[in-house]
């Protein structure tokens, strides 16, 4: 090889190294900008992440940071269907190996959320507990509060309400340390719901009232606390107060789906006190709700009203509509169960095939060794 060719190769290698360093620096800048805008502008964070030309080319910390930030951005933009446990595991494994407790704790938290989406509840709980253990020695109180909040949700889903109440208390303590007003309100609402679930109406009302006082400064929360207070009043047969709470909740609510839920609750109280026309108006207004359970509930209560009035034909028709909506939900759940079974079958089949291939390879290797080995002297 002549000197000119050697110089050309060296120059090319230097150029490639330079371009690589420049690209690495650009990716670092993008990841830093993503981290800075994640909380307030998650849509911008997701858009910035798309500027990284070759995510699969990232290595080490850049790769882990990208995996964590993309999982966060998808979560905050409600793109649950795009979440991947293999993606967030890149971050989990890297940060844990490097001893970065803060980022490892965050990664475990988001891994838990992905497991929750997949309804793998025990895996989610294990991830949250691991996150809590790692974050204990950090000062990221907000994420610690979120971890305990989700542990509370998991316990609540399983009917362990007393445990969930204790978890939610932990979350409030951390949110107070983080001075996060919005999440403190979430904590109060969780506590109120938890106590309401175990029929401790006094405690439920105390937290709901406490949240209501603070809720004016946080959009969307006031209606939620008013609805909770309405449920408590209705449970205690304080119907005039329940009607007032539900009506006020609907008045201040700016979310259409929530407004339908509040209208359904209001209709039930009107039905209890014999104001049938008002009850019917509330139920009819909920028929077009996008939430199948709300619209099905509206048809169910209309059927019940007409049955009590002796109008059995109308009652039957409304009951049919209620049942058909629930059947759609059941079919969707059944399809999911069948798909899960099919995926499990395919995975088991693949594992079996791999085992067979491995055994066949081992047999071939054995026979090769048998026929090529020298005979004993």
Language-model features, listed with the residues they occupy:
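Structural motif corresponding to the intra-repeat A-B loop/turn of tetratricopeptide repeats
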Residues: 77-78, 118, 158, 178, ...
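Hydrophobic positions within repeat-based interaction scaffolds
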Residues: 28-32, 36, 43, 85, ...
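Residue signature of alpha-solenoid helical repeat architecture, marking inter-repeat boundaries
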Residues: 24, 61-63, 102, 142, ...
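TPR-repeat structural position
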Residues: 42, 80-81, 101, 121, ...
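Amphipathic alpha-helical segments of tetratricopeptide repeats
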Residues: 50-54, 89-94, 130-136, 170-174, ...
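N-terminal leader/linker segments that initiate helical-solenoid repeat arrays
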Residues: 21-69, 78-82
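Conserved alpha-helical positions within TPR/SEL1-like repeat arrays
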Residues: 68, 75, 106-117, 142-157, ...
